UniProtKB/Swiss-Prot annotation:
Organism: Pseudomonas aeruginosa (strain LESB58)
Cytoplasm in keyword set: yes
Domain called Tyr recombinase: residue spans: 106-285
Recorded name of the encoding gene: xerC
Localization terms from the record: Cytoplasm
UniProt protein name: Tyrosine recombinase XerC
Ranges of residues in domain Core-binding (CB): 1-85
GO biological process: cell division; chromosome segregation; DNA transposition
Pfam families xref list: Phage_int_SAM_1 (PF02899), Phage_integrase (PF00589)
Gene3D superfamilies: 1.10.150.130, Intergrase catalytic core
Keywords: Cell cycle, Cell division, Chromosome partition, Cytoplasm, DNA integration, DNA recombination, DNA-binding
KW Transit peptide (keyword) present: no
Record's function text: Site-specific tyrosine recombinase, which acts by catalyzing the cutting and rejoining of the recombining DNA molecules. The XerC-XerD complex is essential to convert dimers of the bacterial chromosome into monomers to permit their segregation at cell division. It also contributes to the segregational stability of plasmids.
Length: 303
């Protein structure tokens, strides 16, 4: 079994030319399946059937493997069996039609509107770093950009006169987004300082040396701003989540929020309706005179 696995990995490396990172992922996942198969006394990939594989996956799930990790493992297993079938080394694919167990979907973390304003309304010093960081924070929250979209943003895609920005999102799809007044003002204050840094290319957000900021650098600046202004760790995607949640709460227009976020499937956007309900329930609990009543005083059953 190990020889077949090694042959498949070599096929991925030499013929499919997958990256070293992807190859390592395949190796780790398939070694897990191999270890479980050998522990069960199996000596051939043909001996692994769907029922056994389902049992293996369930065992890994019980050990704490996430649904995403298990889905990746099953994908790797399907790839192995497709290769073995083409090579005439096995007669079936036990992973065909098998899905990873679903875990409860975690709701995205957001800032409430007051906390978002607290983050953005602090005093800003008139220097290179402060103006740049304020501009990128404002743009994250104003337009709901992904981290990769902000990193890749070039000047030619920014139209401050019209208050618009174009970004290239997932699947290489381009979308046009509005830029709010506060974000426009922050960008207008930043761009003259950017020009003085001899930028190497058209990147909107650069370091002092003129190079485009990396994702890691932006994550660090956002986190530092969160600690400084809010006393909490903050991630760029939390600003995107806050943008979506606050917009949906104000407008109720799920389809518009989907378009602005660049979601291909509206089901992805619907997660924010759960956040909106959480907020409404919280307001109800705080404000409604009957919200925290434990039961009727007289124990009656009147409707």
């Amino acid at each position: 079994m190990r020889a077949d696995l090694d042959a498949f990995l070599e096929h991925l490396r030499s013929e499919r030319q997958v990256s070293a990172h992807t190859l390592d992922g395949y190796r780790r996942d398939l070694l897990k399946i191999l270890a479980l198969a050998e522990k069960a006394g199996l000596s051939d990939w043909n001996a692994l059937d769907t029922r056994s594989l389902r049992t293996f996956v369930a065992r890994l799930h019980q050990q704490g493997q996430s649904s995403r990790s298990l889905a990746r493992l099953l994908s790797a297993t399907r790839g192995l069996y497709q290769y073995l079938l083409r090579e005439g080394r096995c007669r079936h694919d036990p992973a065909n039609g098998l899905s990873a167990p679903k875990s409860p979907r975690k709701l995205p973390r957001t800032l409430d509107a007051d906390r978002a304003l607290q983050l953005l309304d602090g005093a800003v010093e008139d220097d290179f770093i402060a103006r740049r960081d304020q501009a990128l924070l404002e743009l994250f929250y104003s337009s709901g950009l992904r981290l990769s979209e902000l990193v890749g943003l070039d000047l030619e895609w920014l139209d401050l006169k019209e208050g618009l920005v174009r970004v290239r999102g997932k699947g290489n799809k381009v979308r046009e987004l509005p830029v709010g007044k506060a974000a426009r003002q922050a960008l207008e204050a930043w761009l003259p300082l950017r020009a003085q840094a001899a930028p190497e290319d058209g990147a909107v957000f650069i370091g002092r040396g003129g190079k485009r900021l990396t994702p890691r650098a932006i994550q660090l600046r956002v986190r530092q701003a969160g600690v400084r202004e809010l006393g909490q760790h903050l991630h760029p995607h939390m600003l995107r989540h806050s943008f979506a949640s606050h917009l949906l709460e104000s407008s109720g227009d799920l389809r518009a929020v989907q378009e602005l976020l660049g979601h291909a499937d509206i089901a992805t956007t619907q997660i924010y309706t759960h956040l909106d309900f959480q907020h409404l329930a919280s307001v109800y609990d705080r404000a409604h005179p009957r919200a925290k009543r434990k039961g009727n005083a007289d124990g009656g059953n009147d409707p």
